[in-house]
Amino acid sequence: MNVLLQELFIIILSAGKGKRMFTSIPKVLHKLAGKPILQHIIDKVLYLKAKKINIVYGYEGKLLRKKIISRGFSLNWTLQSEQNGTGHAVQQVIFKEIGNDNDKILILYGDVPLISINTLRKLLYSHSGFNISLLTAVIDSPDGYGRIIRKNGKISKIIEHEDALSIDKNIREINTGVMVVNRYYLRFWLNKLLNKRNKDKEIYLTDIISIAYKSGNIINSVQPEKVFEIFGINNRFQLMKLEKIYQIEQAKKLLLNGVTLSDYNRFDLRGTLKHGKDIFIDINVVLKGSVIIGDRVKIGNGCVLKNVIINNDVIIHPYSIIEDACLDSNSVIGPFAHIHSKSKIKKNVHVGNFVEIKNTIFGKNSKVGHLSYLGDSDIGKNVNIGAGTITCNFDGKKKNKTIIKNNVFIGANSELIAPVIINSGAVVGAGTTVTKNINRKDKIISRIRQFSILRKENNSK
């Protein structure tokens, strides 16, 4: 591990109520790309291998702990019962935590989800030889942000937007809030803020900058790799904007790595994607969780894939939903198919339109063309399932299994009442209700006999 990161402690400020979100849950639990805003930050800082990660929260602590995944790292949760500013939030941790004077304290914000690990490493590595380092950014529209004030090129203070003079508001270098401070100096400077509050009776963390400057410290600063990394979320419009930025960035990476997207503005990745070569993804496709796609796969418009493995040369026609499933090579799915609940589709299979497959193994070279439901089933090779076939797997108390062995033909509009076994080579006639096991190569049919009803002619005039 790099020496610069060995003494690293992280504080993530997440106590804001998100009033402008008009919500009943903590702002940092609202989702960006399918996971909580705060989770984006945590997932990145875990790569820094800090000694401790402290999350300062304001309310709904139980809900936060439930929704946030620690990925095996022990997160420390600190309550800021009264939201009295960013300085007050950091005080809740730094005055209670025991550590070495030389510890580096990285301060982040739970509502700034797109900051990159490369930018954080850049900030940490540049901190060597300084007591305090800031992440600043130069942006075209700095309204709402605190301005960086420099004297002779050196940072001397930060002025909040509402306190800035007209001349200061022309400054385009802004404070992102992200900083690294040595523990001794952070504690020392925060002590000086104990009795210093703004007009809203809040303690601003940014006030330590002027204290540091006046005591002879040089305030180090670096810029993010990309400006959008420092954008925060205070309302749902800003959340939507960052969602769009995030999705376009993901799409660019995929395009540059050989994936063809029909329209990168209409692609949605809400998890992770591992992919092979020569993949085509049409518009309005949503990928969730862990998605693994092999070579030469084609995915039609409007499909939703969640926690799936798709092997080589699979074609998925439009508006198919595939969740928690594995598709073997050379299969053709959809349109409007629904495959889910640990189903496994073997090689060279056809699953047609309006077919639902749940918790089922569907064997090699088998076909189910349309309008069928196959649940809790084990289906062999070379099986043909006719239109309208359903497995009746639930008896009111438990799910029961249907087993269809190799080379079976099931006629259209058949009902298979589980538990039932249809042995190899059997033929089930159209419209049959199967209530008991069928022997090998048997041909069975059970349907109401067709008959005519004679109508008397009406001779009345």
Curated annotation (Swiss-Prot):
Q: Which residues form the active site?
A: 370 (proton acceptor)
Principal localization? Answer: cytoplasm
Q: Which GO terms describe its biological process?
A: cell morphogenesis; cell wall organization; lipid A biosynthetic process; peptidoglycan biosynthetic process; regulation of cell shape; UDP-N-acetylglucosamine biosynthetic process
Q: Which domain of life is it from?
A: Bacteria
Cofactor: binding details: Binds 1 Mg(2+) ion per subunit.
**Cofactor(s) listed:** Mg(2+)
Q: Could you confirm whether the keyword Nucleotidyltransferase appears in this record?
A: yes
Q: Where is this region: N-acetyltransferase?
A: 258-461
Q: Which UniProt keywords apply?
A: Acyltransferase, Cell shape, Cell wall biogenesis/degradation, Cytoplasm, Magnesium, Metal-binding, Multifunctional enzyme, Nucleotidyltransferase, Peptidoglycan synthesis, Repeat, Transferase
Q: Which GO terms describe its molecular function?
A: glucosamine-1-phosphate N-acetyltransferase activity; magnesium ion binding; UDP-N-acetylglucosamine diphosphorylase activity
Q: Which residues bind Mg(2+)?
A: 111, 234
EC number(s) on record? 2.7.7.23, 2.3.1.157
Region annotation (Linker) maps to 237-257
**Stretches for region Pyrophosphorylase:** 1-236
UniProt: acetyl-CoA binding residues: 387, 430, 447
Q: Identify the metabolic or biological route this protein is part of.
A: Nucleotide-sugar biosynthesis; UDP-N-acetyl-alpha-D-glucosamine biosynthesis; N-acetyl-alpha-D-glucosamine 1-phosphate from alpha-D-glucosamine 6-phosphate (route II): step 2/2; Nucleotide-sugar biosynthesis; UDP-N-acetyl-alpha-D-glucosamine biosynthesis; UDP-N-acetyl-alpha-D-glucosamine from N-acetyl-alpha-D-glucosamine 1-phosphate: step 1/1; Bacterial outer membrane biogenesis; LPS lipid A biosynthesis
**Catalytic activity as recorded in UniProt:** alpha-D-glucosamine 1-phosphate + acetyl-CoA = N-acetyl-alpha-D-glucosamine 1-phosphate + CoA + H(+); N-acetyl-alpha-D-glucosamine 1-phosphate + UTP + H(+) = UDP-N-acetyl-alpha-D-glucosamine + diphosphate
A GO cellular component term found in this entry reads: cytoplasm
The family line of this record is:
In the N-terminal section; belongs to the N-acetylglucosamine-1-phosphate uridyltransferase family.
State how it assembles. Answer: Homotrimer.
Q: Entry's HAMAP family?
A: GlmU (MF_01631)
Q: What does this protein do?
A: Catalyzes the last two sequential reactions in the de novo biosynthetic pathway for UDP-N-acetylglucosamine (UDP-GlcNAc). The C-terminal domain catalyzes the transfer of acetyl group from acetyl coenzyme A to glucosamine-1-phosphate (GlcN-1-P) to produce N-acetylglucosamine-1-phosphate (GlcNAc-1-P), which is converted into UDP-GlcNAc by the transfer of uridine 5-monophosphate (from uridine 5-triphosphate), a reaction catalyzed by the N-terminal domain.
Q: Supply the PANTHER family for this chain.
A: BIFUNCTIONAL PROTEIN GLMU, NUCLEOTIDYL TRANSFERASE
What is this protein's record name?
Answer: Bifunctional protein GlmU
